[in-house]
Amino acid sequence: MSSPHIELHSQRTLSPQPSSNNFELTGNKSCALSASLNGSIDDLNNNNNNNNNNNNNNNNNNNNNNNNNNNNNNNNNNNNNNNDGDKNDKKLLIITNAPTPPLTPPQPTKTQQTLLELNQKFQEQQQQQQQQQQLQKQNKQQQSQKQQEEPPSSQQEEPPLSQQQQEQEQEQEQEQEQEEQSKQKIEGKGGGGEEEECEGGGGGEGEGEEQFKEGDEEEHEGIEIDPNLPTTGYTGKRRSSLQINEASPKLIQTPSVDRTLCILDSLPCPIFQIGIIENTENGNITLTGFANERLTTLLSCSSNLLVDSLKSIPSPHYNTVPSLESCNSIPINNLAPGLLPNTDPTKILDPYISLYNKKQLKERYSNNNNNTNTNNNNNNNNNNNNNNNNNNNNNNNDTTTTTTTTTTTTTTTTTTTTTTTTNESDNNNNNNNNNNNNNNNNNNNNNNNEEIKQNTKEGEEILHESTNSTGTGNSISRPNSILQCILDSFHEQKTITEKVLLSNFLIRQQYKSRATIKPFPDGCICIFEYIENINLNYQQPPTSLNDRINSTNKLTNEMELLSLSPDSNHQHVQKLHNHNHNHHNHNHNNTTQRASSTDSPFIHSVSANSLSSMSSNSSVTSACASLSSNSSSNSNNNSNNASSSNCSSNANSNNTNSSSSNCCCCCNNNNNNNTSSTSSTISSASSTKSKSYLHQQHKNSKVYSTLLNSFENLSFLLKSTPIIIWRADHNGEMVFFKKSDEIPIDEKKVVGNNFQDFLQWVPQTYRTNFQEMFQNSLKCGKIFEFLFWFQTPQNYVQLFKIAGYPIFHIDGKDCIASKRYLIGWLGVTYNYLINDGAEISIKGSANLDSMYEKFKIIYEMPNIERTKLTNNGISSGGDITNANNNGGSSESSNKILEKKKHLISEAEKECFLKCKETYNILFKLSLLGVMFSTFKGIILDANDMLLQTIGYTRGDLENGKIDWMLLTPPEHFEISARALQELKAKRWCQPIEKAYIHKSGKRVPVLITSAMIDGSTEQCITFVFDLSRYRQAEMAAIEATRLKTQFITNISHELRTPCHGIVGMSQLLLDSQLTNTQRDNIDSIKRSTDSLISLINDILDFSKLEYGKVTLENESFELLPMIEEVLDSQATAANRKGIDLIFVMGRDYPVPPVIFGDRNSLKKVLLNLVGNAVKFTETGFVLLEISTDYESGDQISLRFTVKDSGIGIPENKIEQIFVPFGQIDGSFSRKYGGSGLGLSFCKELVALMGGYIRVESGDQEGGKGTTFWFAIKVSISSPSYLPNSVPAANQFFYPEYRPSHYNNVIGNGDSPKNVLIIESNQMVIMSIQSILLSMKCECISASKAITALDLLESSKSTENQIDIIVCSDKSTFVQQILDYVTTEKVILYGVDPNSKYNENSKVYSYLVTPITHSKLISSILLSKNLKSKNSFLTTTNNTNNTNNTNNIENKSSIDSPLSITSTSSSIITPILTSNNLDLNNNNNNNNNSILVSNNGGVDGGNNVPSTLTTIQQSQPKKYILVAEDNDINIKVVVRQLEKLGYTAIVGINGLKALEIIGSFPICLILLDCQMPQMDGFTCSTILRQIEPTGQRIPIIAMTANDSKDRCFEVGMDDYLSKPVRVDRLQKTLSDWIKTDENGNPTNSYNFYPLSYSLVYNNFIDTQLKKEKNDD
C-alpha cells in the first residue's frame, strides 16, 4: 500500500482539534475545507501505536514503552507547531508527508488540469513567501537572544550571562536528542514493509510541515489543490444498478413526500427525508429530498444542497476519501475508521467509527494477550515510561515565560530553533511526582486487567475488522457512504443506524451524531440524534468501555450551542465552561513578545450574565496567549511547551487523570506543583504593568484559559450573520463596533471606534433619546435591550434591536457579580424585523402544538393502519405508551416515528394531486396578487396579478430583483413595521393600506394582508389588492360631486336673485294702500315666491351636505328667539288652515334659555319638521315641545318633539321617507308635492350634530298623526343676566338674577297676578300656563262659560281677584265675558288679525296665533303699565307688516313713542317711529331722496331728481352706502331704507363704492358679496386698510350665498341673507348705528386715500395688465 499523502489548504485556521492524531484543521471562512486522503490512515495509526504490541506480546515490552515515549515526544513537537498556528487565523497550513509512490490516478480532465497548473503556480509563490518569512523569524529569534543576553539594568534578579548560555546549550542538546529519537521512531515504524514506508507523516500523527504566514493581513480566495492528488477517489466497487440521473429535476416531489413536509418541519430533531424513484428499464435513480428546519439551521444549507451532495458516491474503501474535484463539498458522508471526525470537513454528514475508541479497544485486546506474563513486566514498563516522563518534565520545567519555536518539516529533515531559559529549582519536585505516579500506574494496571477481560470479545471483532482493512485492502461489508446506507435501507426495507459527522461550512463547526435511517414505500427518513459539537465539546478518549458508554449517554442535543443569539442559554455555556476546565490544560509559558503583539484589548468571562462565546479552541488559545502577556510570570502549569497552545485546565484543578489528547501524561502529573514555579526573567514587553480591573490574587489563575475570549474570535464565528457587534470598556465608553458579515449597507461599511460613529447610524431626531437610553442602561450594570430606529446612508429607516451584556470577573467562589467586578461590555445590534436577528432563525424552537395536531390528522386516516395519538401518549391497538402531558419532548417525537410506518393510500395520493392542481389554477388565475415571501424581503413566488401590479416580469422574480422591502416607500415604513410585529405575534395581520413603488417609479396604492405559513417561522403568504382603479373612481366621483355642487350653487344664485326681487317688491306693494283684491293677488305672488326660494334652498343645502361642505358653527345663542322664528315662519300657513300651532317648553324639567351649539343647523331641522307637520295636517294641531334630560356638569340632552294630527305614515313607508328624493307613492304625494329632500337632509344634519332622529306614526286611515323627535347633546351657556360667578348649570337655582320684567308683573308689595284661562283645548292651556308660570302668575283654567262666570263672580267677593283674562276668540261666549268684566283686563288670541274684537274697548290686546313667550309677556306688561285701551299696541305676526301698519295709523292718539326692550329677544319689543314718518307714502320726497352713483358721478335713479336736493337744516339726513349690482334689489333696499328714515347712496360695484366713500357722512355700509369688477370681499378688505386707527365703520353683508365665515374673515361686522326683510333690516341698523336723543348719528368716519391700501394697488395693477392683454 502506498504511503498516505495529506494536504489541507486554507486561508484561515478553523480550530485545533484535540485528538490523538495531532494535526490541525484548516478551512476557508466561506466554503468547506478540502481534504484528500489516499491510503489507510487508520491502519497507519494502528500500526504506529499497536503493531509492536501485537508482534512482541511477551518479549518486547520495554521497547514498546520506549516507542510510546518517543511518540509522546513527537506529540509535544506537534503541539508546538499548533501553538504557533493559533497566533494567526489567516495562516496557510500545508502538511505533507514523505514522497512515496502515490496511487495512480486517472487522467485529469481539461478543467482539472487547468486547476492543477494554477495550483502549482500558487505553491511556488507560497514557497517563496514562506522562505522570506522563515528568514524574518530567524532574525527575530536572534534579536530576542541578544536582548536576553544583554538584559536591562532594572532586571537585577536575572542570573549571570554565562550561566544562561549554559542552560541554553543544555536545552538545545535535549531538543536535538528528542528530534533524533522522533526520526528513529518514524523510520522504525516505516520499516515494517513496503506499504508502511513513510517519512515525516506518521499516518495522521501530525508530524508534518507547518508553514505560517506571519502578519499576512490579506485573505486569499479560493482553495488550492495538490497536483499530486488523484482527480477522483472512486476506485472501489460500486453498485452495479446504481446510476444517478443527473438530468432529472432536483425537486420532483412524490405525494408522500409532499404530505410529510409540514410534519417534518415541526419535529424537534433534525430529519432528512429522501424520496427515491427508480427506473426499472435502465436502473437510474432520481433523488428528491427535504430537510426540516432543525437540520438546515444546524448545517446552514438548503435541502437542495443536501440532495445534490448525495449524487457523489465515495469509494467503498474506508481508506479513501474523494478528492475535491469529484465532490462539491459533500454535505453528508460516512467517515473511514482511520480518519478522525474533525479531519474531513468537506462533508456535512459523515458516518464514522471513532478512532480513539477503536484504538483503546485494540490496546486492551493486546494487553489481554500480554496477561500471560507476570505483573513485574508491566510494572517495569511503567517505570521506564515514568522515567522517560521525568526527563520530559525536566525540560518543561526549565522553560520560564517565553518560548519561540520555528518548525519546518520537509522530506527528510526537521529544523528546530529554541530559545529557553532554564530553572533547575523544579527538577526535584518533578522527580517526586514521578515516583508517586509510578505507584499509581501499578495500581491502575491491576485494576485494568479485569476490565480488559470483559472486553476481549469486542476487541477481537474490531481487531479482525482492522486487519482485514489493512492487510487486504479490499472493501469490508460495512457501507461506506450515507447514500449507500439509504439505498440499502430502501431496498432491504430495514432500519439502519450509523454514526455520522455533520459539518457546517458557514460557521465552520462540526458535530458528531447518530443517524437512524428508516425506509418507507417512496424513500427513507434519516433521523439525527445525540448531536454534539466536537469543536467545542471534544472530550478525552474514554479509558474503558464503561466510560465510553457513559460518555455516549451524556451526548445531548447540542444544537443550542450553535445559537448565535445574545440570549443563549447560559447553562450550555456553563457546561462548556466546566467541560473545558476538566479536559484541557493551558500553559502560560508562551513567548511574551509574541503574546503581547497579539494581545486582545478586550477580556470577558463566561458567566450567567455574559454572552456565550462560540469560539473554537484556536480562539481560546489565542485568548490564552493574550493573558500571558498581561499576567505576571508565576506560572501555574509545568507542562511541556509543545502542548501549551492546545491545552487548558482549571487553575485549582488537582485532577491528574484528565488531559487533552494532544498532551502526554506528564502534563497531568505535575499539576500539584503549580505554586513552586516562579519566574526569574521578565520580558521587556511585559515589564510595565498594564492597568487591570481584576483582583490581584486571581491575575495568574489558569481560569482565564476559558474565560478570556477576544472580540475578534467572536466576530470570526459570526462572519455570515448580519449582526453588529459592539464592545465598551468598564466605564461604558464604546470602543469598537463592526458588522460581523462585513457586508456594507448602502455601500458604507458599518464599523467604528467610538459612540459618535455609532450615532451616525441613528436618525438625527432620535439621537438624543437613544444616547440617554444607552447611557442609562450601561449605568445599571445589567443585561439590557431596547428598540431604536436605524438609519441607512440612503435615509431608509429600519427598526433595530440593541442588547448589551456586562462582563464580570468571577473567581470561581460563587461570588455575586457587581459593578466592581465589571470589566467591560459586549453587545449586539440587529434588524428586529428580519427573523429577530439570529435569535429566531437559529434557535427555531418547534411548535409542539402544531406538530401534535398534524400527526393526529395523518395517523387517524381511514383504511390503513395508523398510530393514534392521545393526550396521555401514543396508542397503537391496545398498547399505550405513556408520554409527557406537555407534549414537548424530543423523545415523544422519536417514539412516534419508531412506532409505526407512515403509509398513504393511492386514493389519497390522487386526491392530493387534484388538490395541488386546483391550487395551481387558483394561484395563477386569482384576481388578487399573491406572493410567498420571507421576513428578509425575499419574494419566493408570486402570481401574474401581483407582477402586473408592480410592473415586474417573472424573469425579474427569478433573478432575485424583486424585494418587497424595497418596493415599500419610506412613508409607509412605520405601518409596515407594525404589521410585521402583529404578524409575528398573532401569525396574521389586519389589512392595511399602503403603496408599492412600480417599476416605472409611480406609486401604486394597495390593500394587503398576510398570514404565516403553517410550520414556518420565516415565510408568509401575502394577498395584495390593487386599489388604483378604486382610487381613480373615487377621485372621479369626488370631482363629479364637486362640479355638480358648483353648478347647483351657481344656478341657485341665479334663481334666487330674481326671486328676492319679487319678494321684495311684493312686500313693498303690501305696505301700500291697496284694495282687498289687489292685496290678495300680491300676497299670492309673495307666497309662491317664498315656496320657490324654499325649494331652491333645500336643493342647495342637500348638495352641500353631499359634497361635505357643511360644517357646524357652534356658538352661544338664545333658544326661545330661534323657536319663535320657526313658529312665525309657519304661522300664516297654520292660521290659513285653522289648525293650532302649539309650543310647550320645559313641562317636567326647566330648559336653559342659552345653549352652545349650531343655531342655523338646528333651525333648519325644526323648519323642515314643523313645515312638514303643517303641510300634511288639515285639521287639529301641530305641537312643538322641548324637554331636557340633565346629563352631567354643563352637558344636557335636548329632545325636540314635533307631533301632529295629520294623515300619518304607513309602517312600510317609514324607512323610505329618509331616502333622498323618497316620497310616499299615491295621491298624497301628488296632492302635497315636495322635493323629498327635507327629511333626508334632517337625518344627515342631526347625525352631524351628534344626535339621532326617530319617527312614530299611527294608522293612516285613522288619522292618528305622526310624531318626529330627535335628541342632541349640547352645552349650557350662561345667559346675559347671570353673573360670571354663578355657573351656567346652576342658573335655575338663582331666581333673583332673572330678568326684571319677570318681577315687574308683581309690583312692590303686590301679590302675584291671577290669570283666568278660558280654553277648551288642554294643549293650548298647557302652553299658556308654561309661559305664565315663568312670570310667577297664578293660573286658573275654565273650558265652559258657566264655569268662567262663576270663577269671576267668586273672585270679586274674595281678596284673590282675577286680574287678567286670556281667552280665544273661537269661544261662543266671548261676548258674555266682555259684558261681565269690569276692571279685569282681557287678552284675546285668534288667527284673524282683522278680528272684530280688535275694535272692542274692553279688549286690551289681541294676539295672532301662535302664542309665544314674547307676545304674551309683552301684552301682560302693557296691561300693567297702561291704564286705558288706547295705550295698548296690537301685537301681530311679524310677517304681516300690513296689519301692523294699519294699527299704527289708528293709534294716532299716542303722544310719545314707547320702546320696551326685552333681554329674551329684541324682536318682541315694539319700536315706534316718529309721528311725521308716513310709511304709506310711496312717493319720494325731499327728505328721502335716493342718490345713485353711476360712473363716478352722483345721479338720480329712475324717477330720481338729477341734482341733489338741499337738505333741511331742521332734520339732518342719515346716509347709508349700498353696494349692489341688481336694479330690482337696489329698489327694494332703497324703499326699505326710506321707510326707516335713512338715505341710500348706491354704488353698482365695489370699485364705485370706494370712489364715493369720502363724499358723504356715511354711518353704515351695506355690501353685496357678488358684484362685477370688484366683489364685496375685496371692497371690505380695502375699506379696513384705509380706515384710521381706532375707527371702525359698520359693514353689513348682503348675499344669497351662505358665506358667513368668509364675510367675517375680510372684516365685515354682520350678515343679512337675501331677501332682506324690513324687520330684520330695522333690527340690524338699530344695533350698529348709535344715535343721540334727537335720533342723529353720533359717530363720523374719515378715510385715508385709496393709495394707502396695498390690496387696492395690486387690484389696479391687475386690471391694467388685463386691459393690455385684451388690447
Swiss-Prot record:
Residues 1519-1633 form the Response regulatory domain. Part of the osmoregulatory pathway which leads to the increase of intracellular cAMP concentration in response to hyperosmotic stress. Thought to negatively regulate the rdeA-regA pathway by acting as a phosphatase towards the HPt protein rdeA. Has probably no histidine kinase activity. Residues 1-10 have a biased composition (Basic and acidic residues). Residues 11-27, 591-600 have a biased composition (Polar residues). Residues 168-179 have a biased composition (Acidic residues). SMART domains: HATPase_c, HisKA, PAS, REC. Gene3D superfamilies: 1.10.287.130, 3.40.50.2300, Histidine kinase-like ATPase, C-terminal domain, PAS domain. Keywords: Phosphoprotein, Transducer. CDD domains: HATPase_EvgS-ArcB-TorS-like, HisKA, PAS, REC_hyHK_CKI1_RcsC-like. This is Hybrid signal transduction protein dokA. It comes from the Eukaryota. One of its GO terms (biological process) is osmosensory signaling via phosphorelay pathway.
